[in-house]
Amino acid sequence: MDRPRTPPPSYSEVLMMDVMYGQVSPHASNDTSFVECLPPPQSSRSAWNLWNKRRKTFAFLVLTGLAIAMILFIAFVIYVFNVNRRKK
């Protein structure tokens, strides 16, 4: 005798699972009414928060470094341009 089949998961259930496991951000789609009230899984909460902080810090450092490098590069180009113009 066949066991009763479980229905396939709905779109919202799949999306909730993806959000819980961090594969999708809760703001990926406009239909997030069911995601907003979803707490992060309790077991790995502190580690997850720590990782998020580390990732944000890392992104901040990278972006700051890129901004400084861009400013230095522009200053260098202006300096070279001025030196070349003075020689003529």
UniProtKB/Swiss-Prot annotation:
Subunit structure, as described in the record: Interacts with host ITCH; this interaction probably mediates ITCH degradation. Interacts probably with NEDD4.
Tree of life domain: Viruses
Annotated protein name in UniProt: U24 protein
UniProt KW Lipid metabolism keyword: no
One GO cellular component term: membrane
Organism: Human herpesvirus 6B (strain Z29) (HHV-6 variant B)
List of residues that carry Phosphothreonine: T6
Membrane topology, record value: Single-pass membrane protein
Function recorded in the entry: Down-regulates the TCR/CD3E complex and the transferrin receptor TFRC in host T-cells by blocking them from recycling back to the cell surface.
